[in-house]
Each structure stands twice: as C-alpha cells, then as structure tokens.
Curated annotation (Swiss-Prot):
Residues 630-665 form the UVR domain. It comes from Pectobacterium atrosepticum (strain SCRI 1043 / ATCC BAA-672). Its main location: cytoplasm. InterPro entries: Helicase/UvrB_N, Helicase_ATP-bd, Helicase_C-like, P-loop_NTPase, UVR_dom, UVR_dom_sf, UvrB, UvrB_inter. GO terms for biological process: nucleotide-excision repair; SOS response. This is UvrABC system protein B. ATP binds at G39, V40, T41, G42, S43, G44, K45, T46. The UvrABC repair system catalyzes the recognition and processing of DNA lesions. A damage recognition complex composed of 2 UvrA and 2 UvrB subunits scans DNA for abnormalities. Upon binding of the UvrA(2)B(2) complex to a putative damaged site, the DNA wraps around one UvrB monomer. DNA wrap is dependent on ATP binding by UvrB and probably causes local melting of the DNA helix, facilitating insertion of UvrB beta-hairpin between the DNA strands. Then UvrB probes one DNA strand for the presence of a lesion.
C-alpha cells in the first residue's frame, strides 16, 4: 500500500484556514474542476494547501511563476512533509540561447546552453517519484509545460534487476549504454558505471547520494546493495532495484529507426516544395543539415537538436501536443497554481514566442516543418490536460474567477490577527515633502518604508532628493539580479537603511514584517502599475506590520483606486469583526532575517549521516553571486574527492554536506 502524506507542523489551522480547508476539500471530493483560494498576504495560504494535500492523499503538482518562488515553496513543503517525496522541477539551464535565424542580416545563431547538473538530477528524481509513488508533491515552474520524454517510452527503457535473476554481465552493460550511462572506471559520478570483475557499480542519474552495487556469480545476480558513492560504505542490501534512464529523452533503437524513415519521407516532400518555389539555397541547406542529423542518429542513437524530431520519436501526429510533466501526473492528481494572476498568463504566452522563432527556421530551410511540434503546450491543451485545479492568489484575475464560477474561497483572517493596512489618499502637489515627513516619523521608531514610483527617472530623482535630506535610502530597479535584490531586502530588514524606492515593488512573495508604510506616488495615473490588482498587491506589503499603513498620492480617486480601497476596507472590517468576536489581539510577525536567504535549504534536512558541519560555514557564502557559488561548489567537490581518494572519509563527508547546503542556496537564488 502506498504511503500516506504526513503533515509535520507545530501549528493548527486558525483564522479563516479551517473553513478554507473544509471548502477546498469538499469541492475536490464533489468533483469541482476549478476552485480559487483568495488568500491575503500573511494568511498562511501554503499551510492551507498543505492541509488539503495531507487530507486528500493525492499526488500534487504546484506551479509557481518563477524559480525563486518555486524554491521558496519547495522549502516550505519540505518542512511540512519531511517523510514524503517533495520534488523540484524547474528549467535546468543556467544559460540558454535557442537556435534562431535573422533574415535581415542573414545571421544564424546556433543553440548554446549550459545545463545545471544538480537541477537535472532533481528533475529526474521528480519524474521517478511520480512514476513510483503516490505521496508526491512536485513544485514546478512553467518549465512543466515544455516537451519532455514520452512516459511510456521512458518506462519501457527502465532496467529492472532482482536478486537471483539470470542475466550476463554483457547484457547489463549493453542495457546501461542504451540508457545513455557512460562507463568510467576512474571518476565515479552521476550517470556513470564502473566494472570490477563481476561487480558492477552504477550511480543512478536521479540520485546524488546513493549508488547501486550489482554482484554477479556465473550469470546470476547474487546480491544488490546500496552504498555511499563517496565513502564506499554499504548502506543496505535490497531484493530488487530499478534503474531509470539518464535522460528523459532516451528512445528505444527500433523507434529511432522508424523515426529516421519518417524523417526521410518528410525531407523528400519538403525538398519538392522548396524547389517548386525556387528556394535552392534553402533546399540545399535543409538536405545537408537533415542528412547529417540522420547519420548521427544511426551511429549514436541521438543527434544535436534531437528534440526537433520529437514528433516522430514520441509517435505523435502533426499538431498533437508534446509529452510534458503533466503526462507523468496520475489522472487523479491535483494541480495548485500559486500566484495564479501571474502564472496563468505565463502559461498562455509561452507558445506564441516559440512558434514565431521556429517558423523562421522552417521557412529558411534550417528545420523541417515537424520541428514546429517541438514546443510548449498551447493554453487550450493545458486546459484540456490539467487535472482538478486550485488557483491561489491575493488578487485572482478574471480567468480564475470565471473558471471557479464566481465561487471564491476567502482566506482574509490571518492566524496572527493582523489587519490589512489603513489607507489614506493625499494630494499629489505636496507628495514628496509629505512623504519625507512620514519617513522621518517611521525612521525614528525603527520602522521601514517602501515607496513606489511610476518611472525609473522619478525613482532616481526621489532617491537623490531623500539622500540630500539625510535619509538612508536605496533604489531597487530591474537591472539588479536576484541575489543582489535579496541582499537589498535583507539590508532593509536589518536596518542598514530605512527607505526602499522602486517602480514595481508589488513583487509576490516580498515578505518584510518591518515595513510599516507603503507610499504609492501618482496613484491616480491609470495603467498597469496602478491597476486594481497592482495596488492591492503593493498595499499588501505593509500587511505584516501591526502599524501597517498605505498612503496613495492622487488628486482624484480612479476606478482602480476605489476598487482597491473598497476591497482592503472589506477585508479589514472582516478581520476586525473576527478578532473582536474571538478576543484576538493582533501580534506582529518576528520572522528571522536569515530566512529570506535560505529558501529551499531545508531541502537537505534529515539527509545523510552524522553531524552537519555545513550549516556553520554556509553563512560565509550568503552574499555570493550564482556564478561565484557555482565555482565554490566545484572547488569543494574537488577537495572532497581528494579526501575520499586519501581515505579521509570524515573530511570528505563534511565537505559533501557543505556542498549540499550550497547547492540548495544556489537553487534558491538562480
């Protein structure tokens, strides 16, 4: 029987959470396809979803709008479900330049990519968990709608080994080569195997800390054991083990041969079309490139850019959707879309950009028309394939509300009793001087201020003006990378400065309890940055403070302002009524400042053996850029292997633990 979800938390549902959990569960059990959870900032939406997952015991996919929020969700879910499979599935590219052609300058840009091995391992681990068990939560980015290997072919390619089975050594080695594992008797690493007499050591592609030892005796599997690849220490013997392919795109030989025949037929047809239109250069280019790919596929079983032939390799017809992570999710799975007002439009936008680039490649003879089927899912395909869905947002868009039939589950009351900010509207004419006096009031009592402007120029001028008047102020803009952004937010919370000025400070997941004032300049200028949703999100940044307040500077109240003010007041009234009825006194949030830099670090909680020395030195690396972190990880891995070769296993294990902590930090900030 499959393992059940076990929720680990010191807290019990409170505020609006019990009612939200009950209604979401009832809706799912009644077969509702779409539900919306409208949860205000700081109301514990993730905890509510965790309770629903634990009670229903169904495999779940959680979609987040970006890698940073995905890492944050992954870390939270790891803490809630330490005994279950919580997996992470985001794009494994540190850098990606797709192939493209610019006709105006006759420039062809080759595909160039840098793959993050650790994230690739986590992706393989995610699909393995979905295929093997039911107690799975996969936290994914929009990468989940991009093409992946066909799950049926992936399952067919697996190598099952059981104790006592009859199989000779050569057959095992041949199968490992088909799974794209490489033999390496010197450097034993993920996705490789080594042979020593009748003993084969295999390092599974989806694992980062356990390897398999297969001991043969006269064409019979005598023993299967799991061991630590670093120390060689045997952890346990197992009666059976399944080895998964090294990549999601592995394909059986017979399917490759069939695909090659289909590609030849398409090439002949396409050449006729190009010649009929006097496109001789394009015909020559297409023939040369495709023939080269066919030769490589025949010799090696794959070629560079093999994903462009995915229609034939997965056996799908023209125009059919590609296999994606959704094909690995069981039919009764659950989909949770976090920050749905941002994530849903992202899903809709991916297909069009990809299509425009590929059409140019096809038109100018760089690719066959079938390459157009190597694409992300269309929005309609996503809708058709998505299982029962819960949309989670503080500001759901019309799409979610329409899909849920207007039946929105409110989670307005916070367990802490905190109220939504008080809102004031003040004239634009004196906004800068008025803001300066408000900042001084807040700075005097060690509180922080967020200021949002409409343009970059205004943000720069305001920052300069405030600095001239002796205020400690910093400016946040789009050129700042994720790590530096996290550093600035951390410094604001620590009190290194008092005021943060920016243009788009409504960023979801910006969690700063020290901020007691949000000032929105030119709030009466209708547009994207001053829409109802943007205003509510920005006002919500002051909702984690006991004295939270939002000042909207405008000479008139626009429709968006009126809606945002009315919605905030509705929430505040409901919160006050609940607090009065239950005798709750609002409490401020004391969130550890280090937390914001440790997204996903809990991922490694409970792994490995012995004392974790890694947590101590990790602080030294908190402010490193992703590139510097990657170099540090490589340096530590090199030292670790040196210690292992010198049989200094204690030192090697300590470095291994430190590398794992740094990898988790790298995921969080990349």
């Amino acid at each position: 029987m499959s393992k059940a979800f076990t929720l680990n938390s010191d807290f019990k549902p409170a505020g609006d959470q019990p009612e939200a959990i009950r209604r979401l569960k009832e809706g799912l059990e009644d077969g509702l396809a779409h539900q919306t959870l409208l949860g205000v900032t700081g109301s514990g939406k993730t905890f509510t979803i965790a309770n629903v997952i634990a009670d229903l015991n169904r495999p779940t996919m959680m979609l987040a709008p970006n890698k940073t929020l995905a890492a944050q969700l992954y870390g939270e879910m790891k803490e809630f479900f330490p005994e279950n499979a919580v997996e992470y599935f985001v794009s494994y590219y540190d850098y990606y330049q797709p192939e493209a052609y610019v006709p105006s300058s006759d420039t062809f840009i080759e595909k160039d990519a840098s793959v993050n091995e650790h994230i690739e391992q986590m992706r393989l681990s995610a699909t393995k968990a979905l295929l093997e068990r039911r107690d799975v939560i996969v936290v994914a980015s929009v990468s989940a709608i991009y093409g992946l290997g066909d799950p049926d072919l992936y399952l067919k390619m697996m190598l099952h080994l059981t104790q006592g089975m009859l199989i000779d050594q050569r057959a095992i080695l041949r199968r490992l080569a088909e799974l794209q594992y490489a033999r390496n008797d010197q450097a034993f690493q993920r996705g490789t195997f080594r042979v020593r007499g009748e003993v084969i050591d295999i390092f599974p592609a989806e694992s980062d800390e356990i390897a398999l030892r297969v001991e043969l005796f006269d064409e019979e599997v005598e023993r299967l054991s799991l061991f630590d690849p670093l120390t060689g220490h045997v952890l346990q013997t197992v009666p059976r083990y399944t080895i998964y392919p090294k990549t999601h795109y592995v394909t059986p030989r017979e399917r490759i041969l069939q695909a090659m025949e289909d590609i030849k037929v398409e090439l002949a047809d396409r050449k006729k079309v190009l010649l009929a239109n006097d496109k001789l250069v394009e015909e020559q280019r297409l023939s040369q490139r495709t023939q080269f790919d066919l030769e490589m596929m025949n010799e090696l079983g794959y070629c560079s850019g093999i994903e462009n032939y995915s229609r034939y390799l997965s056996g799908r017809g023209p125009g059919e959707p590609p296999p994606t992570l959704f094909d690995y999710l069981p039919a009764d799975g659950l989909l949770v879309i976090d920050e749905s007002h941002v994530t849903v439009p992202q899903i809709g936008g991916m297909y069009r950009g990809d299509r425009a680039r590929k059409e140019t490649l096809v038109e100018y003879g760089f690719r066959l028309p079938s390459a157009l089927d190597n694409r992300p899912m269309k929005f309609e395909e996503f809708e058709a394939l998505a299982p029962q869905t819960i949309y989670v947002s503080a500001t759901p868009s019309h799409y979610e509300l329409e899909k849920s039939g207007g039946d929105v589950i409110d989670q307005v009351v916070r367990p802490t009793g905190l109220l939504d900010p008080i809102i004031e509207v003040r004239p634009v004419g004196t906004q800068v001087d008025d803001l300066l006096s408000e900042i001084r009031l807040r700075a005097a009592i060690n509180e922080r201020v967020l200021v949002t402007t409409l343009t970059k120029r205004m943000a720069e001028d305001l920052t300069e003006y405030l600095q001239e008047h002796g205020e400690r102020v910093r400016y946040l803009h789009s050129d700042i990378d994720t790590v530096e952004r996290v550093e600035i937010i951390r410094d604001l919370r620590l009190g290194e400065f008092d005021v943060l000025v920016g243009i788009n400070l409504l960023r979801e997941g910006l969690d700063m309890p020290e901020v007691s004032l949000v000032a929105i300049l030119d709030a009466d200028k209708e547009g994207f940055l001053r829409s109802e949703r943007s205003l509510i999100q920005t006002i919500g940044r002051a909702a984690r403070n006991l004295r939270g307040k939002a000042i909207l500077y405008g000479d008139r109240i626009t429709a968006s302002m009126a809606k945002a003010i009315s919605e905030t007041e509705r929430r505040r009234e409901k919160q006050e009524a609940y607090n009065t009825e239950h005798g709750i006194v609002p409490q401020g949030i004391n969130k550890k400042i280090s937390d914001i830099l440790q997204l996903g670090q809990s991922a490694n909680k409970g792994k490995g053996r012995g004392n974790r020395k890694a947590a101590e030195p990790a602080a030294r690396y908190e402010l490193m850029t992703p590139k510097a972190l990657e170099l540090k990880i490589r340096e530590l891995e090199s030292k670790m292997l040196t210690h292992a070769q010198n049989l200094e296993f204690e030192e090697a294990a300590a470095l291994r633990d430190e590398v794992q902590v740094l990898r988790a930090q790298f995921i969080a900030i990349s």
